[in-house]
Every structure is written in C-alpha cells, then in structure tokens.
Swiss-Prot record:
Protein name as it appears in the record: Ribonuclease P protein subunit p30
Keyword Nucleotide-binding tagged: no
Gene Ontology molecular functions: ribonuclease P activity; ribonuclease P RNA binding; RNA binding
Subcellular location: Nucleus, Nucleolus
Main location class: nucleus
Function per UniProt: Component of ribonuclease P, a ribonucleoprotein complex that generates mature tRNA molecules by cleaving their 5'-ends. Also a component of the MRP ribonuclease complex, which cleaves pre-rRNA sequences.
Gene Ontology BP term (one): rRNA processing
GO cellular component entries: nucleolar ribonuclease P complex; ribonuclease MRP complex
Residues carrying Phosphoserine: 251
Modified residues (N-acetylalanine): 2
Species name: Bos taurus
Family stated for the protein in its record: Belongs to the eukaryotic/archaeal RNase P protein component 3 family.
Length: 268
C-alpha cells in the first residue's frame, strides 16, 4: 500500500491552526507531512528561524486513517530567490538551514531557475502557479536537476481558490510536463487551512489535469515524495564527510618519476 505525503503545510504563528492542518492530513490518509517555513529575503541580513518542534504541536501524534500508525511530521524551508545574492545562504551551508529536513527554493527568474537546477544544494525547485510563467522551461537544466535527484513541486490549493490561478496552474504545469515528462514531480497543497487539503487520490486526479500519466500522478503524492525525503537525508548526512582512499606504496625501483640514474642505483 502506498505511503502518501503532503510536503507543504504552511507554518504560521497560530499553533492551533497548524495542529488542525496536521490532524486533517492524517484523517485524509497522509502518512507524512512537512511543515513549510517560507522565507523571502527583503533585508540583506535576515535571519532564518528555527523549525517548529513537533513537541510544541502534539504530545500524542494523530493516527493516520486506515494505517494504525502515527503521522510523521517533518520540517521544510522554502527560500524565495529573486536575486543571486539570496542563494548565498544555501551555498554557505548555514547551520539553521541544516536543521530542516527538506530545503526548497522558489526561483523568480530564468537565470535563477537554471542555477537552482544545476548548482544549488536543495531538494525541491518550486514552480510558480499563481501567475503566468515569466520564462520558458528549457530541457538542459531540467535534465541536470533530474539527474541530481532534485524534485519539481506544483501546488494545487491556489487552483481551488481562484479560477484565474487555476488557469495559470494548469498552463504552467503542462509547460513543465512537456520538458520533464512527469519525472521527479510532486504535488503539494500549500494549505493554510484544513479545508484546503484534498485527499491523496483526489490530488492524483488533479495530476491528470496537469499533464501527468496515471502512474506519474500517483507517484507525485507517494514515491516521488519519498525520493525527495531520501535526497534531504543524503544532503544532511553527507555534509562534512570526506572520503579517503589509501594509495598503495610503491618501491623506488617501480617509481617512474625517479631519474634514470637513481633508478639504476636502486636496482643495483
């Protein structure tokens, strides 16, 4: 049986509302959720907050509908980048950034989208759904992102709220699918209220409208989400690890870098 995930429940100052989001997600059958803290740099030296602790939300975790297991709550950081300088916080491997289970980036220009796909150490690249896409997707950076294991995220709650956003969501999603062919795509809610979350099978049906095949639409709320989580674990654990290889010791007689006269002396 598939394990469903919603990797974008919006964090807010109201913990009671956040509890309601998590409880509703568990009731709808989601086994994993991520509480998303979104940062948009309006000041040069803006601090990244620590993630919300699960212990602050629940003493006992809600049970997933039909699973008899408690829901798993992860933390996520999304950084909106509209200027190249905003990427520095990711390149500097900030200690606050490493506290989050998932790190996503929302690039606002084509150049920053290219950088996010090819260079930034992130798990997700967010696709705009609330306005017309400001650039065309190109195959090379998207293929690099797929090879690196980076996912692409589409949000569905804006499409529920507004008919204009619905058109943008479907149009931008179809443009993405033409290039990535449904690979590494996840669909999340970005829900701020419990009523904005839909069940995983309903979300998979929305995926068909976004241009995904039936199998890719289901993967967008299950296996592709798991791949993002594994990518995040690898990113966190691989930081600071150095691989060493022991070089076999060679005798002076076998060393080609020695002068011929010295090598002859060694052999004698």
């Amino acid at each position: 049986m598939a394990v469903f995930a919603d990797l974008d429940l919006r964090a807010g100052s109201d913990l009671k509302a956040l509890r309601g989001l998590v409880e509703n997600a568990a009731h709808l059958g989601y086994s994993v959720v991520a509480i998303n803290h979104v940062v948009e740099f309006k000041e040069k030296k803006q601090e990244i907050e620590k993630p919300v602790a699960v212990s602050e939300l629940f003493t006992t975790l809600p049970i997933v509908q039909g699973k008899s297991k408690p829901i798993k709550i992860l933390t996520r950081l999304t950084i909106i980048v509209s200027d190249p300088s905003h990427c520095n916080v990711l390149r500097a491997t900030s200690s606050r950034v490493r506290l989050y289970d998932i790190v996503a980036v929302f690039p606002k220009t084509e150049k920053l989208f290219h950088v996010a796909c090819t260079h930034l150490d992130v798990d997700l690249v967010c696709i705009t759904v609330t306005e017309k896409l400001p650039f065309y997707f190109k195959r090379p950076p998207i293929n690099v992102a797929i090879d690196r294991g980076v996912g692409f995220e589409l949000l569905y709650s804006p499409a529920i709220k507004d008919s204009t956003m619905r058109r943008y969501t479907i149009s931008n999603a179809l443009n993405l699918m033409q290039v990535c062919k449904g690979k590494n795509v996840i669909i999340s809610s970005a829900a701020e209220r419990p009523l904005e979350i839909r069940g995983p099978y309903d979300v998979a049906n929305l995926g068909l409208l976004f241009g995904l095949s039936e199998s890719d639409a289901k993967a967008a709320v299950s296996t592709n989400c798991r791949a993002v989580l594994l990518h995040g674990e690898t990113r966190k654990t691989a930081f600071g690890i150095i691989s060493t290889v022991k070089k076999p010791r060679t005798s002076e007689a076998d060393d080609d870098s020695l002068p011929a006269c010295k090598k002859a002396k060694c052999e004698s």
